[in-house]
A protein has these predicted regions:
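Gly/Pro-rich, tryptophan- and cysteine-flecked surface segments typical
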Residues: 424-426
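Bacterial N-terminal signal peptides
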Residues: 13-25
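Extracellular, repeat-based ectodomains that mediate carbohydrate processing or recognition
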Residues: 31-422
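Bacterial N-terminal signal peptides that target proteins for export
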Residues: 2-14
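Cleavable N-terminal signal peptides
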Residues: 20, 30-31
Length: 428
């Protein structure tokens, strides 16, 4: 049972409107899904990778041409780290898995912190990551590799994205459909100076850097960037965590060509509590962003998760509590359906036994539904670090899944289907 506190759950008449508006959509296999009291369906839990090692930091992208997902993650082996991937159909079938990096053209040292985006024009993914330049941890750069939709091509080698002398961390990538290029953002940590956030526009065909520039710098550290692309305007919103007297969340809108829009950076969450580790998604049908974060309401470790709408023209709107109990809720992730009409938030929450499970919440541009459990913790094992992507009629959420009774960490996931309307079949 979840931590013992009465939880406020929001219900919305949009639940009914959503069923009527969505009409008929594809269903999972009969008997393969759990139907919630709120009408959505959870597909069966899927073991994405169970190789005997430790896995971290899953990231997910949706392939609109082939109606499938790609999950990437970081492996930790004795003595090294690398990046693997698994293709998964929109019905939850495992299609193929493969190594991403180190790949052709790269050094043999560690790769970590992957992020992935899909290019429907070239029908391939860009996976970005940090890599250990000298193998001693003294300099970490940003690299990338294009992966065709059905698996790696040895002719598509790793390429550099940022090779500055300062170390780079936590890269995130998105694809701009109208601009037909990628945007990558990351944190720089120059020696003896505050950390700051940078970005680069990448050519979709070659990976060449078209332009790189500073997103935000100043006397305080800027860390933990995330980025979303808004097709309605051909614009981006980059968000980050600014560390001053407390942690606050800021954002900056960019044109498709990377030019900062009027007004510059703006505050999204700046209250006395620490607001940390932002995530952002764009729903282009509503011309809107959803920014979420964890807020330290009970130091030192009791976080709640909050979210705020930001309009397409950069006006912060309603703030709402996503989940809050006397136990920590943190590490939140946001995504949106491909057609831009509904968000999904996923996060980890501590249960009464002290171990984490994964929860989620469907959010519309004007309201949200009740939160729901995706997976409970094991008897003595965590489920953490959720990530998700939205497809045409469902989402895929993935997480780090401690293997019960071992030191291994696997990657698991499950599909979340939209509200569906079933009519009885009449046989005459």
């Amino acid at each position: 049972m979840k931590a013992n506190i009465l939880r406020t759950r929001f219900k919305s008449i949009l639940l009914i409107l959503g069923i009527l508006a969505l009409g008929f959509v594809a269903s999972p296999r009969p008997g393969s899904a759990t139907v919630s009291a709120d009408g959505f369906q959870l597909g069966p839990e899927v073991v994405i990778s169970a190789i005997d090692n430790e896995k971290y930091l899953p990231a997910v992208a949706y392939n609109s041409n082939h109606d499938e997902y790609l999950v990437v993650w970081q492996n930790k082996w004795p003595g090294n780290r690398d990046i693997y991937a698994q293709r998964i159909s929109s019905r939850g079938e495992l299609l193929s898995w493969f190594a991403v990096a180190p790949g052709p053209g790269g050094n043999p040292y560690d790769r970590a912190q992957p992020s992935v985006a899909y290019d429907p024009v070239n029908d391939r993914y860009l996976v970005v990551f940090i890599h250990d330049v000298f193998g001693d941890g003294s300099d970490w750069d940003i690299g990338g590799r294009f992966i065709p939709w059905n698996g790696p091509d040895s002719g598509l080698i790793e390429f550099p994205i940022c090779t500055w002398n300062s170390s780079q961390w936590n890269p995130v990538v998105t694809y701009a459909l109208a601009q037909q290029e990628f945007l990558v953002a990351w944190t720089n940590t120059p020696s003896g100076q505050p950390a700051y956030v940078s970005a680069a526009r990448l050519n979709r065909d070659t990976g060449a850097v078209l332009d790189d520039f500073t997103i935000s710098a100043g006397p305080e550290n800027r860390i933990n960037p995330d980025v979303a692309y808004n097709l309605a305007r051909n614009e981006y919103l980059v968000v980050w965590d600014r560390v001053g007297g407390s942690h606050d969340i800021y954002g900056l809108r960019l044109t498709g060509s990377g030019v900062a829009l009027s007004g510059g950076e703006f505050a999204i969450a700046g209250w006395p509590d620490n607001e940390e580790q932002p995530t952002v998604a764009a729903c282009h049908n509503a011309d809107q962003y959803l920014v979420a974060w964890q807020s330290l309401v009970g130091p030192p470790t009791n976080y709640d998760v909050y979210a705020r709408y930001v309009s397409g023209d950069g006006v912060p709107g309603t703030v709402f509590l996503v989940d809050g109990t006397t136990a920590p809720e943190d590490t939140i992730d946001a995504t949106c359906l491909q057609d831009g009409r509904q968000y999904l938030l996923t996060w980890q929450t501590m249960y009464a036994g002290g171990y984490y499970g994964i929860w989620g919440r469907l959010v519309y541009p004007v309201g949200m539904e009740a939160s729901f459990g995706l997976v409970q913790p094991g008897a003595a094992a965590d489920r953490t670090a959720p990530a998700a992507a939205g497809g045409q009629v469902n989402y895929l959420a993935a997480w780090v899944h401690d293997r019960d009774g071992t030191a291994y960490q696997d990657i698991h996931g499950r599909l979340i289907y939209l509200h569906q309307l079933y009519l009885p079949m009449v046989v005459r």
